[in-house]
Amino acid sequence: MASKTELDNLFMNIAEQVAQMSKSRRSKVGAVVVKDGNIVSMGWNGTPPGFDNNCENEAPDGTLTTKACVIHAEANAILKLAAVSGGR
């Protein structure tokens, strides 16, 4: 049986991999929701469903700023969990 530390490290590694799903050019963030040692949801930072999945505005000088509509990875993971669990 894996120790709690080993499992925590595993879940962190998975979150880092999930982050690669983000379309953000500035900051890719991933999150996993774990219950009783099992992953029950995953999420990454990005725009809400129905929005163009472009996370940044680009200034003429090339500076990128995050759009206000971008949802944090942990919020996306919780929203996905709520959607599949019926909010329970």
Per-segment meaning from a language model:
Residues 1-88:
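Zinc-dependent deaminase catalytic domain
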